[in-house]
Amino acid sequence: MKRHVASLLAQALKAMREAGELPADLELPEVQVERARDRAHGDYAANTAMVLAKPARQKPRDLAETIRSRLPASEAIAGVEIAGPGFLNFTLTTAARQESVRVALRQGAEYGRSDVGAGHRVHIEFVSANPTGPLHVGHGRGAAFGDALASVLEAAGYHVHREYYVNDAGRQMDILAASLWLRYLEAAGEPVSFPNKGYQGDYIVTHARELFEADGREHVRTAAELGAGLPAEDDDPEGYLDALVARSRELLGETAYRRVLDFALEAILGDIRADLDAFGVHYHRYFSERQLVDQGRIEHALERLDQAGYTYRADGALWFQASVFGDDKDRVLRRDNGLTTYFAADVAYHLDKIERGFDTLVNVWGADHHGYVPRVQAALKALGVDAERLDVRLVQFAILYRGGEKLPMSTRSGEFVTLRELRDEVGKDAARFFYVMRRSEQHMDFDLDLAKSESADNPVYYCQYAHARICSVFRQLEERGLACRVTPDEAALERLDAEHEAILLDLLGRYPEVIESAALAREPHQVAQYLRELAAAFHTYYNAVPFIIDDEALRDARLTLVQATRQVLANGLGLLGVDAPQSM
């Protein structure tokens, strides 16, 4: 309906220009229509007259009067009023409001979907946690946000590709391999010393024992061999770690070292996949950083930057002139030891996405990566790519509270709350809904006690209970032989004249607009907020209006209304990855 109102306004402006009521050379703006904030002022409002007043050299209210006179007739519009400095307020007919009920039931699971995206190809990369440990609650928010955003974009007609970038190359993988091997040696009875900067979690011990069970003592070396020639850890912890990695690689040999590294990677990545699957998050592809190396994609990207004239050599390293494109300084692509940097791999990965034909790249990153955005944008500009094609969404970490107390989290020490633990405690649905209730860039306090409560204060429970309650209504009426006997097209929806019914009708008609708005703004929290509003309206209606009445026509109309409400609740919850239960 919002599009219909915008179309009427566009037709009116065109007619005015043709009639000489607007300058012939005036460029008509894209018509903006919004839901009226106060239902007393109508259903939709447009500020078109105020936007055009200055370029048209007319008073806003006079221009609004002319626009109103030029609006085509519409069976959906009951009236148009001019308010304030020149707002055009549109009021829908009762029939137009009721039509959303019929459309929702006619379209079912498709209700709310549109073609606003016009098949635009969107690549969305999210989570992409290093495969060096289990997913924690911070990753969980990125997973819930990214997956919900992808679903909302799909519902709005975009062609979406979900991808997880696996950082399976570089120093952190060597540290992982060394950490696992040391725990493996412990499992074999060797009294080795574990570095403070190694990966400390129990998951390393678990996977090391699995390696020992699989390969026996094949990779065992003595503690004396390992410690020979290593520097003191206290003097330079990071240098000690690098020396330990080099010593591990030397003692094992390349084949055995690769076996240990691959075992660790596959075990942890397997855990990550399992956690995401259980969280309802699925990808089209897990993209390996190693693939960029093996297929020469990093060298290809560096050659492209060099050909464009934006690289130089200094201090034995290869640099990118990022500062030319607005970054605060130039960035190293290849170190003086010949190894490429993480940034070089990121440039190659983004170029690869572009060369795969995606129109827009959406990156869901932790808020701590905000400083990384300008350098990636700079690289794209240098490669001749419009930086506007990159849309980085920053996600703040969630802070967990239990009993009013903040829970600590530290990945370095191995003491952190994993996504699996959160899911086991509050359930997938509560976790996913809580994660997307607010804008992704806002700090979030996650109250575990609230997420587990069965009360109106728990937003996911409140929304799911609304759906289950409607299902219960139909079960009870079926048992009494009072089930709805008419189709949506036959229902006497004109009987729905109570204020609570008008509110529900208005909300049901808004749903497609909410999906479109959430997609265009890249804000799935809009859907969560809408569902809370719809659930609250239904519960109020349920408590105020009886369904078991003798008036069959009114009863069937009310049942048709709540059935449409159930459908919209199910559709919206589905986009957020939350189940819509039949009973609770």
Curated annotation (Swiss-Prot):
Its main location: cytoplasm. Keywords: Aminoacyl-tRNA synthetase, ATP-binding, Cytoplasm, Ligase, Nucleotide-binding, Protein biosynthesis. One of its GO terms (molecular function) is arginine-tRNA ligase activity. Its EC number is 6.1.1.19. SUPFAM superfamilies: Anticodon-binding domain of a subclass of class I aminoacyl-tRNA synthetases (SSF47323), Arginyl-tRNA synthetase (ArgRS), N-terminal 'additional' domain (SSF55190), Nucleotidylyl transferase (SSF52374). GO terms for cellular component: cytoplasm. CDD domains: ArgRS_core. It catalyses: tRNA(Arg) + L-arginine + ATP = L-arginyl-tRNA(Arg) + AMP + diphosphate. It is found in: Cytoplasm. GO terms for biological process: arginyl-tRNA aminoacylation. Belongs to the class-I aminoacyl-tRNA synthetase family. This is Arginine--tRNA ligase. It comes from Halorhodospira halophila (strain DSM 244 / SL1) (Ectothiorhodospira halophila (strain DSM 244 / SL1)). The gene is argS.
